Every structure is written in structure tokens, then in C-alpha cells.
């Protein structure tokens, strides 16, 4: 018995090797799991649930096949796919989670999240996040023609790339005090997140001498990153080569 966690695949038609590796994962590994958690940034950018492209349908089909075969799939929105909505959930059978969710892993409580909200030193990003998460703005964006939304997103992505070049690695990493604050808020000793693209398993000793664990999922740019949480043996963070597409 085991549960799987992935994040930060940044799926895009531009990266067929990542897409092929994801499809293989869904069909050969996820299908055998008790549940699958996707902790944000599945897509390089999700423009909206009205995406008519073959690529979008291909990805939705993989989730639909998985959930129809009885494997629960839970989805946390990331900073690249925060526009995933109810229509996507209905079409795929996935269950959308709030920004922070407490789950039960075979008797172990854990808080799962994408991880961007832990980076409290990145104030410019958090200001941007607050703006684009406003419901009225998302509704307005959703009313735009798909082609216009694509154009706007390309501009946003370009601005984000330029902004990243001027940020230090420390600013883009999590703030330790925020990690502890979130774990205390939910009274958990285990946190699982993505976003930073720095896969690792961290042990944290708090002021009250409690030992806590923070597991960070990696991206799929050059290899896969999968957290396997087994009922019998606990957790292991795995990576595998991507499928080579000639």
C-alpha cells in the first residue's frame, strides 16, 4: 500500500519527453497506487478550463482513465496552473484541494501545499499572487477569447523570466519560520511541497524539541521526481531518467 506525490512537471507541447514520461508514470505507476497527489505546476501554464487543444485533452484523458479505474487523485494548484477549475475537475475526476490541506497518510497527519506561499521573502511574487487570485479578475480573464488569453500569458511568462534573473536563490527558497508556523498551525510533524525545484528531505527541530520533517519534491526538467509514501516502509524520494524522444 502506497501513495504517490508529484509536482512541477511543467507539462507543455514543447517538451514531449516530459509528457511521455508523465503518461508512462500514470499508466504504469499511478495506477498501482492507493492515491495520487499532484502538488501544483503540473502544467507550464494552464490558461483555462476552456483550453481546446489536443494537448490539454491528452493530459485530461490520462487523469480521467486513472480516476475511472478507482485511483483517487488530488490536485493542489500551483503558481503556473492556478486557473485549473471546477470544469477541469469534472472532466477528469480529480479532487481540487485548498492551498493548504491536511491529509492522513496511513495514520500520519501531513500538510500538503504547492510551496510558493512559504517563500515569504519574495514579496514581489506574493503581491502578484494576491492580484491574480482575485475571483473577479479570474472571471474577467475567463471571458476573454482563448487566443487573446494565450497572448497575455506569453507576456506574463516573459515578465516572470526577466524578474527571476534579478532575484537571489535565497529569496526564491522557503522561509524556515514560515514552514514551522504552517506546521504548528495544523499541528502536524510532516510537510510535503514542491515549487522550489530543490528535492530533499529536511529534518527540523523546533524550539520545543519536536522533530519535524519537510519533504520537497523536484521538477521534471531533466528527470522525474516522485515521492512514494508506503504504509510499511515510510517515504522515499525517487528520480528516474526521462523517456528519450528523438
From Swiss-Prot:
It is found in: Cell inner membrane. Keywords: Cell inner membrane, Cell membrane, Hydrolase, Lipid A biosynthesis, Lipid biosynthesis, Lipid metabolism, Manganese, Membrane, Metal-binding. GO terms for biological process: lipid A biosynthetic process. Substrate binds at residues 79-80, 122, 164, 167, 195. It catalyses: UDP-2-N,3-O-bis[(3R)-3-hydroxytetradecanoyl]-alpha-D-glucosamine + H2O = 2-N,3-O-bis[(3R)-3-hydroxytetradecanoyl]-alpha-D-glucosaminyl 1-phosphate + UMP + 2 H(+). Its EC number is 3.6.1.54. GO terms for cellular component: cytoplasm; extrinsic component of plasma membrane. Pathway: Glycolipid biosynthesis; lipid IV(A) biosynthesis; lipid IV(A) from (3R)-3-hydroxytetradecanoyl-[acyl-carrier-protein] and UDP-N-acetyl-alpha-D-glucosamine: step 4/6. Binds 2 Mn(2+) ions per subunit in a binuclear metal center. Its main location: membrane. InterPro entries: Calcineurin-like_PHP_ApaH, LpxH-like, Metallo-depent_PP-like, UDP-diacylglucosamine_Hdrlase. It comes from the Bacteria. Mn(2+) 2 binds at residues 41, 79, 114, 195. Pfam families: Metallophos. Hydrolyzes the pyrophosphate bond of UDP-2,3-diacylglucosamine to yield 2,3-diacylglucosamine 1-phosphate (lipid X) and UMP by catalyzing the attack of water at the alpha-P atom. Involved in the biosynthesis of lipid A, a phosphorylated glycolipid that anchors the lipopolysaccharide to the outer membrane of the cell. Belongs to the LpxH family. This is UDP-2,3-diacylglucosamine hydrolase. It comes from Vibrio cholerae serotype O1 (strain ATCC 39541 / Classical Ogawa 395 / O395). The lineage of its organism: Bacteria, Pseudomonadati, Pseudomonadota, Gammaproteobacteria, Vibrionales.
Amino acid at each position: 500500500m502506497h501513495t504517490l506525490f508529484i509536482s512541477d512537471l511543467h507539462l507543455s507541447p514543447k517538451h514531449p519527453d516530459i509528457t511521455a514520461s508523465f503518461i508512462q508514470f500514470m499508466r504504469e505507476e499511478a495506477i498501482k497506487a492507493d492515491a495520487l497527489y499532484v502538488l501544483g505546476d503540473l502544467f507550464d501554464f494552464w490558461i483555462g478550463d476552456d483550453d481546446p487543444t489536443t494537448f490539454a485533452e491528452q493530459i485530461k484523458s490520462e487523469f480521467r482513465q486513472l480516476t475511472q479505474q478507482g485511483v483517487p487523485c488530488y490536485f493542489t494548484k500551483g503558481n503556473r496552473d492556478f486557473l485549473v477549475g471546477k470544469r477541469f475537475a469534472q472532466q477528469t475526476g480529480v479532487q481540487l484541494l485548498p492551498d493548504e490541506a491536511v491529509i492522513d497518510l496511513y495514520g500520519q497527519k501531513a500538510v500538503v501545499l504547492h510551496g510558493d506561499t512559504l517563500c515569504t521573502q519574495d514579496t514581489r511574487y506574493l503581491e502578484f499572487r494576491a492580484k491574480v487570485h482575485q475571483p473577479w479578475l479570474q472571471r474577467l480573464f475567463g471571458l476573454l477569447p482563448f487566443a487573446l488569453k494565450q497572448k497575455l500569458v506569453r507576456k506574463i511568462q516573459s515578465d516572470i523570466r526577466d524578474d527571476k534573473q534579478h532575484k537571489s536563490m535565497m529569496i526564491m527558497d522557503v522561509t524556515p519560520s514560515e514552514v514551522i508556523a504552517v506546521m504548528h498551525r495544523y499541528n502536524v510533524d510532516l510537510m510535503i511541497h514542491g515549487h522550489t525545484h530543490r528535492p530533499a528531505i529536511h529534518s527540523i527541530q523546533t524550539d520545543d524539541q519536536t522533530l519535524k520533517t519537510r519533504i520537497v519534491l523536484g521538477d521534471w526538467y531533466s528527470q522525474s521526481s516522485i515521492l512514494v509514501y508506503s504504509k510499511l516502509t515510510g517515504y522515499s524520494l525517487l528520480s528516474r531518467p526521462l523517456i528519450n524522444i528523438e
